[in-house]
Curated annotation (Swiss-Prot):
PTM text: The single chain, almost fully active enzyme, can be further processed into a two-chain fully active form by a cleavage after Arg-314 catalyzed by plasmin, tissue kallikrein or factor Xa.
Stated name of the protein: Tissue-type plasminogen activator
Catalytic function, reaction form: Specific cleavage of Arg-|-Val bond in plasminogen to form plasmin
CDD domains linked to this entry: EGF_CA (cd00054), FN1 (cd00061), KR (cd00108), Tryp_SPc (cd00190)
Main location: secreted
Length: 566
């Protein structure tokens, strides 16, 4: 009898795996604020999803062809590994791999890069919404007030008309997440936020996609998964076949597919990206055979867009900030000469996938390029970010006429090293800044922003441990002269900006400081943050009526283009 019990127990272990709890990855949350009732929930640290008591779910393991089966029990997620097989139906979107538990109907989707969610239905690369945002499936989660959106699966939304537990939630973009959506075809994406003891709906601060200078403004964002435009020609000029063409009966993606409407397929020949490819495409009849080609659809302008989070902590010289508020900010490090490791050198600005702008004076010691390293997506100067991207430097270019005495022509370019034609991948934490038009002239005293990891004040012994932002105003050229800067040389390649607040305590005026060099001075233009200056030099930090001096970017657009051509 004992032997039989042991055998049965061993069999259970082999089939199901050992059950365990992981309190470090799951959070026991007690939602007890205002009118909300006491609820026990579990938060899955791997997927960042929340579950109610007795809910169960699957999550993929990093190793092997197995997944974990988990359930919420008393605020803790209990999990064990289970064997899986390929799903009988293709439940996953965007090329996700479907795995079904061997002894149940539960399944899990292993998503390709750039997608997430239970069914890989969330496009992590989408940075803005088109039209009303009904098809928006990005990851923006901040309301216009700055409040964080509530999870659509929250128990407090059970009686709301739109929640993640609706039968058609997936089709509406709702689910176990807190990302902005527009399920009711309102004027723009929105979400629920908790205010004054109750959940209310509020429009999101998600940026609208800019119209490109095309005849019809038709463009795609990310990889074009949500593209629902009307373009119907490929890059070679071929006309697309209708998705219900008789020639496509043997193809996977057609107007007859069960989820065709959700994929944008139908009785038309408009370009689409139903399989999560690199960009919109279509079927074409070419050279007497059926094939497919990428479409001639331009990509929407996404530079200068951000998920701005209102700073919560005021410090000397500025405000602590999150990298998603300044996703073009780069941190440049250099190898130590006499000891292992590397040290922070300067700030930088991402202007394209493989190019970073900075200040020439940062590289006066002519470091070998392989001694430099560029970090993108980092909120804390010395702590890796969740979506951080790291690059070695292939080469850097200092302006030939840089004057190390006056800091005239204080501009440099760093070329990031990559094995492919692209380097930085766009995300909420990493994005390019818009370069200005050569004719850009902003009004005097326009409020702009700068960011960096520099010192809080000139007497500080250390650089800031966290990214900071500062709000300054553009000085008129008549106030940006040697006379106003203690006879220091000021050239036409420079501009001035500073904190113009008056009265009260002036010891906390916003300004750049040592360590911020090479970072961005950006201003809003046509709903996009646009690079106006590069942090160059100043007389002290945060002194009343003494502006900081910046490299005037409009004077170097030709130089930038000439040096970044392939």
């Amino acid at each position: 009898m004992m032997s039989a019990m042991k055998t049965e127990f061993l069999c259970v272990l082999l089939l199901c795996g050992a059950v365990f709890t992981s309190p470090s990855q799951e959070t026991y949350r007690r939602l007890r604020r205002g009118a909300r009732s006491y609820k026990v929930t579990c938060r899955d640290g791997k997927t960042q999803m929340t579950y109610r008591q007795h809910d169960s779910w699957l999550r993929p393991l990093l190793r092997g062809n197995q997944v974990e089966h988990c359930w919420c029990d008393g605020g803790r997620a209990q999990c064990h590994s289970v064997p899986v097989r390929s799903c009988s139906e293709p439940w996953c979107f965007n090329g996700g791999t479907c795995r079904q538990a061997l002894y149940s109907s539960d399944f899990v989707c292993q998503c390709p890069e750039g997608f997430m969610g239970k069914l890989c239905e969330i496009d992590a690369t989408a940075t803005c919404y088109k039209d009303q945002g009904v098809a928006y499936r990005g990851t923006w989660s901040t309301a216009e007030s700055g409040a964080e959106c509530a999870n659509w699966n929250s128990s407090g939304l059970a009686m709301k008309p739109y929640s993640g537990r609706r039968p058609n939630a997936i089709r509406l973009g709702l689910g176990n997440h807190n990302y902005c959506r527009n399920p009711d075809q309102d004027s723009k994406p929105w979400c629920y936020v908790f205010k004054a003891g109750k959940y209310i709906s509020e429009f999101c601060s998600t940026p609208a996609c800019a119209k490109v200078a095309e005849e019809d403004g038709d463009c795609y964002t990310g990889n074009g998964l949500a593209y629902r435009g009307t373009r119907s020609h490929t890059k070679s000029g071929a006309s697309c076949l209708p998705w219900n063409s008789v020639f496509l009966t043997s193809k996977i993606y057609t107007a007859w597919k069960s989820n065709a409407p959700a994929l944008g397929l139908g009785k038309h020949n408009h370009c689409r990206n139903p399989d999560g490819d690199a960009q919109p495409w279509c079927h074409v009849w070419k050279d007497r055979q059926l094939t497919w080609e990428y479409c001639d659809v331009p990509q929407c302008v996404t530079c200068g867009l951000r998920q701005y989070k209102r700073p919560q902590f005021r410090i000397k010289g500025g405000l602590f900030a999150d990298i998603t508020s300044h996703p073009w900010q780069a941190a440049i490090f250099v190898k130590n000469r006499r000891s292992p490791g590397e040290r922070f050198l300067c700030g930088g600005i991402l202007i394209s996938s493989c190019w970073v702008l900075s200040a020439a004076h940062c590289f006066q010691e002519r470091y070998p390029p392989h001694h430099l390293k560029v970090f993108l997506g980092r909120t804390y100067r010395l702590v890796p970010g969740e979506e951080e991207q790291t690059f070695e430097v292939e080469k850097y270019i200092i302006h030939k006429e840089f004057d190390d005495d006056t800091y005239d022509n204080d501009i440099a370019l760093l070329h990031l090293k990559s094995d492919s034609l692209t380097c930085a991948r766009e995300s909420a934490s990493v994005r390019t800044i818009c370069l200005p038009d050569a004719s850009l002239q902003l009004p005097d005293w326009t409020e702009c922003e700068l960011s960096g990891y520099g010192k809080h004040e000139s007497s500080s012994p250390f650089f800031s441990e966290r990214l900071k932002e500062a709000h300054v105003r553009l000085y008129p050229s008549s106030r940006c002269t040697s006379q106003h800067l203690f006879n220091r040389t000021v050239t036409n390649n420079m501009l001035c900006a500073g904190d113009t607040r008056s009265g009260g305590d002036h010891t906390n005026l916003h300004d750049a400081c040592q360590g911020d060099s090479g970072g961005p001075l950006v201003c809003m233009k046509d709903n996009h943050m646009t690079l106006v200056g590069i942090i160059s030099w100043g007389l002290g930090c945060g002194r009343k009526d003494v502006p900081g001096v910046y490299t005037k970017v409009t004077n170097y657009l030709d130089w930038i283009r000439d040096n970044t051509r392939p």
